[in-house]
């Protein structure tokens, strides 16, 4: 699932292709197809939860940017250079370096020893708002967005339906992320 879809090549999983600035991602099924896409100067996007392609593709660099807040299986031996993004990775153990993702003056720092700042479970404070900034599923079911990324919304405005239940904005502002239509969600996601 991708929330910030306008800046993520992962949306190619649902759209077959995705562009972010001057980069184009193309959905592929295997290593051979990935190699063809790379030869065209484009980025292959592959659904591979176990990262099995690493064994046959032998990449020079692996970047785990799943943002799961924990390491789901990335190993420092996966490639000559392995990067973990966000909490859950320990530089020198799980990967060669970690990129800090916590909002603030350390955002984007490269960590060569130790780990990223642990996940607090609370979004960064912007203008006095933390959890209110999130749009969460009100019920299990299919996601039906009403608002789109970039829309200005008011507090209390209907922004989506999940499992046919309404989801309302908890604050006024601009929608910066929204799951795509027709994905299965669970309450609270």
Predicted feature residues:
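Well-ordered secondary-structure scaffolds
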Residues: 1-189
């Amino acid at each position: 699932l991708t929330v910030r879809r306008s800046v993520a090549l992962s949306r190619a999983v649902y759209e077959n292709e995705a562009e972010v600035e001057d980069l184009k991602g193309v959905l592929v099924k295997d290593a051979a197809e990935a190699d063809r896409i790379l030869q065209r100067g484009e980025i292959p996007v592959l659904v591979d939860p176990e990262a099995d392609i690493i064994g046959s593709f032998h990449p020079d660099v692996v970047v785990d940017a799943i943002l799961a807040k924990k390491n789901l299986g990335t190993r420092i031996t996966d490639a000559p250079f392995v990067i973990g993004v966000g909490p859950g990775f320990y530089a020198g153990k799980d990967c060669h370096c970690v990129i800090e993702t916590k909002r603030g003056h350390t955002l984007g720092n490269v960590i060569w020893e130790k780990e990223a700042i642990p996940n607090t479970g609370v979004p960064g404070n912007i203008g006095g708002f933390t959890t209110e900034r999130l749009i969460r599923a009100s019920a299990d079911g299919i996601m039906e967005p009403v608002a789109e990324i970039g829309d200005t919304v008011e507090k209390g405005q209907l922004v989506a339906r999940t499992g046919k239940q309404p989801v309302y904005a908890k604050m006024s502002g601009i929608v910066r992320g929204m799951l795509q239509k027709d994905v299965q969600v669970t309450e609270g996601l």
